[in-house]
From Swiss-Prot:
Cytoplasmic face of the membrane: 1-3, 88-98, 162-173
Organism name: Homo sapiens (Human)
Coiled-coil intervals, chain numbering: none
Name listed for the protein in its UniProt record: Lens fiber membrane intrinsic protein
Positions of modified residues (Phosphothreonine): 171
Gene: LIM2
Length: 173
């Protein structure tokens, strides 16, 4: 059980760090505009060496940002539950902490996938046509790696829960 929780906690830390870095950086998309390179993130866009805030209140930007923030909150809550799973205190005895951590990481995964799907759909269908020479960049790729890490954190915590339940049910009363 502890090895599953340790693996889950490792994946959780890495996934959450990648998620926060992806959300905070400005390299989701790179393109060429008027002969110079430009790049953009969720919060800013940069032309040359000068960056500007994204002040447009466009629905897909707001949805992508909201889902990324929800994902980060779920991942942080999952880490807290995952750390609490190592303690054997009788508080919250009706709620399994590894199970709760697993649910939080699956929720985080769902929110990241929704954010990346919205961003991908809009970028390919609208922005891709607007800018001829463009590509997704490293911040966006970190988001997809965070999907894998939070998903595997959820898997590890669900395995830890299953092992714990099997042991609990097999011990005589």
């Amino acid at each position: 059980m502890y090895s599953f929780m340790g693996g889950g906690l490792f994946c959780a830390w890495v996934g959450t760090i990648l998620l926060v870095v992806a959300m905070a950086t400005d390299h989701w998309m790179q393109y060429r505009l008027s002969g110079s390179f430009a790049h953009q993130g969720l919060w800013r866009y940069c032309l040359g060496n000068k960056c500007y805030l994204q002040t447009d209140s466009i629905a897909y930007w707001n949805a992508t940002r909201a889902f990324m923030i929800l994902s980060a909150l779920c991942a942080i809550s999952g880490i807290i539950m995952g750390i609490m799973a190592f303690a054997h205190q009788p508080t919250f005895s009706r709620i399994s902490r590894p199970f709760s951590a697993g649910i939080m990481f699956f929720s985080s995964t769902l929110f990241v996938v929704l954010a990346l799907a919205i961003y991908t759909g809009v970028t390919v269908s609208f922005l891709g046509r607007r800018f001829g020479d463009w590509r997704f960049s490293w911040s966006y790729i970190l988001g997809w790696v965070a999907v894998l890490m939070t998903f595997f954190a959820g898997i590890f915590y669900m395995c830890a829960y299953r092992v714990h339940e099997c042991r609990r049910l097999s011990t005589p009363r």
